[in-house]
Amino acid sequence: MAGEKDQSFFRNQVVADFGCGPRGSLCWATQARERIGIDVLADAYLHLGADRHNMRYVRSTESVIPLGDDSVDVLCTLNALDHVHNLPVICAELLRILKPGGTFIGSFNLNEPPTVTEPQTLTPEVLDQHLLRFLELKSRRQVPRGESSAYEHFFSATPAKAPAADAVQVLWVRGVKRGRN
């Protein structure tokens, strides 16, 4: 994940996935000290067999993630922030739980029109304002959304053409949280 050659990056780390979904998104991170899935539907996932994933599920709300300040070493969120109603509040919560010097890994679908289940239209400017400016970015890759797969341009040998600013795109970032916000 995020350009690491193996899982040793996660060794003895507390790793969390915000918007984890029901499928054990961190099952593979076996070298982590603790794996935490954070989701508003976490309680429901336990009834779907999530208790077999060898990770702790934590139910968040749209305004509170019930973890301590600076408690997470590696925080992932993959295509989840467009699902929240109050982006500034949840971004502040993500930054609160991530330790200074901790690694943030995120993927975001950009410029998609809002829907009932995805009420946010994320743009680079909105993400910079509420989240990314608090990180020292190590990598930032923004490509057009693929036609057959949202992520096809990340894995193809042919580089994508630069997208128009308002085109539907995918942004991947990896950064390190700066000192206290």
State what each model feature region is.
Residues 16-64:
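Class I SAM-dependent methyltransferase SAM/SAH-binding core
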Residues 74-85:
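A short SAM/SAH-binding and catalytic strip from SAM-dependent methyltransferases
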Residues 1-14:
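Conserved alpha-helix/loop element of class I SAM-dependent methyltransferases that forms part
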Residues 101-109:
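Conserved beta-strand signature within the Rossmann-like core of class I S-adenosyl-L-methionine
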Residues 148-181:
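Core SAM-dependent methyltransferase catalytic element
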Residues 63-75:
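A short acidic, Gly/Pro-enriched loop at the edge of an enzyme's catalytic core
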